[in-house]
Amino acid sequence: MTEKVFDTTLGTIHYWVQAGERVQPWLIFLPGLTADHRLFDKQMEGLGGPYNCLVWDAPAHGASRPFRLEFSLEDMARYLDGIFQAEG
C-alpha cells in the first residue's frame, strides 16, 4: 500500500492505495465512525491484485488529524471526489 495525502482548507486527509499497472476496477473502503484505514488491511492485501484499492482515514480520524470540525457530509463527498480525480 502507498500512503498519499489530499489537502483541504480544514486539514489533510491521509489515504492509501494499492493499484496495479493496468486499468482495472476500483474498490473503495470507507471505515466506520470509530475505525481507521487499518480495518481493511486484509482486504487491501487480498484484493489488491485483481482490483485497484483505496482506503482513507476520514477527516478527523486516524492519521487525518488534526482536522477542523467544520465540514459536512457534502464536504466529505467532495473530498472523496477530489481523491478519485487525483487517482484517475
Q: What residue ranges belong to the model's regions?
A:
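Conserved HGGG/HGGXW glycine-rich cap/lid loop of the alpha/beta-hydrolase fold
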Residues: 14-63
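Active-site loop/oxyanion-hole signature of alpha/beta-hydrolase fold enzymes
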Residues: 54-88
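N-terminal cap/lid segment of alpha/beta-hydrolase-fold proteins
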Residues: 1-12
